Amino acid sequence: MKKSILVSFAVLFAAVVAVGCKRSPKNKEYVYDVCVAGYEGKAPMLWKNGEPTKLSHNGTDAIATAVFVSGNDVYAAGLECVYDNGQDQADPPRYVGVFWKNGIISRFTDLAGKADLEVNDLFVSGGDVYLVGQDKFGEEPVAMLWKNGIAETLSDGSKFARAYSVFVSGNDVYVAGDHDGVALWKNKILSKYTNDSYSEAHSVFVSGNDVYVVGRVSKTATLWKNGVAEKLTDGSNTAYASSVFVSGNDIYIVGFEERNSKKVAMLWTKRGESGRWETKDLTDCSKGAIASSVYVIDNHIYVTGS
């Protein structure tokens, strides 16, 4: 029997998006398809409404880390392991970035040709495909942006830097991540929100003229709205905000808080500009859990995690 590691890994790296719609003549409600990306065993996977599809790859280790839907097209992004001698036991392997459009794979390599490349997020706008992650040419990882497979460096390698999230609004490209602290790049121009090496941004969302970034500062889950920080937790327990979604004046954030050495998946919600934060445990402390991605549509909240 094939051993499945769907629960451990597919959801851990998942991204969720609600897509497509069709009218139901009976109740006049929209019905949405939900796509989740991840992997099972050595295979990158895409689930649509819970139905799994194995994404094409070279047969070695591969994962899908993000999913995005634009019109009728479904995009996924991830990594594929490459062994230079053609064997699957080479040491060390290297990784190439991959993305799939409607199941058809495209590959792009790291600039060094041998580094540990990672692809963390995906956004499609105006037919252009944006991916972010990190590459490594020397001692420190370099934050990266790929547009249609063409690599652009966001950092120079002098400091630890990674890119975790990308959002495109009009002609502006926003990337959130880590540059020896919480970092936001707008059109490749860096803004530092903190100088704390134990802090990082993991998600960015743009609504109108407002830019929302979430992550952590040391042990505290934190939201930045237009660069102004707001604590989601008091710092007594280790906590992390991993994803943010804004619908109108409502803000939805997911992540985790550690209690009694167990991670509890969390949802923080703020409804309206003058509303108060509501905190909801999505799991109990019986098993460790992390909420990694959130999407909201028609007042329905979709969360993935592990």
Regions from the PLM with identified roles:
Residues 1-9:
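Bacterial N-terminal signal peptides that target proteins for export
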